[in-house]
Amino acid sequence: MRTEIATLGEFGLIDRLTEGIKPENESTRYGVGDDAAVLSYPSEKQILVTTDLLMEGVHFDLTYVPLKHLGYKSAVVNFSDIYAMNGTPRQITVSLALSKRFSVEDMEELYSGIRLACQQYHVDIIGGDTSSSLTCLLYTSPSPRD
C-alpha cells in the first residue's frame, strides 16, 4: 500500500522516519523533533544546529520575490529556529543548489540579502556548498546557545 506524504504532513513524516532512532553520542542532548538539535560539550556550552530548506515553487516564487529578499529570508528563517530554542545565532553555512538560469550577478544579489541579515543579527557566514539542480536552495545554521 502506498501512503501519500500529504496524509502524514511534515511532522508526521519526521516522526515516521525517525521512529526508534536514539542518540548514541553523549554530546547529543536533543536530536530530531524540535526546531534545532542541542549538542552539549565539556565546555558546558550547548550547540544548537538547525537546517531549513527553501525550494522554488514550494516556499517562494521568483516571479514575485526579489533575490535579495529571498537571501534575507533564507537566513532569518534559520535564525528564528535558534531563537525558538532560546539560543543566539552566531554562524551560518549557506548551501545552494542552482539551475543554469542563475548568473553570478543573481547569486551576488541573493548573497546581498544573506549578508544584510547576517550584519543585522551579528552572524558569521562560515561556509557552505553549491551544486547544480533544477530549482532548489538550501541553508543550514549552527549556533552556540548563550
Language-model features, listed with the residues they occupy:
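Extreme N-terminal cap/leader segments of soluble proteins
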Residues: 1-66, 85, 94, 117
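Conserved small/polar residues in nucleotide/adenosyl-binding loops
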Residues: 139-146
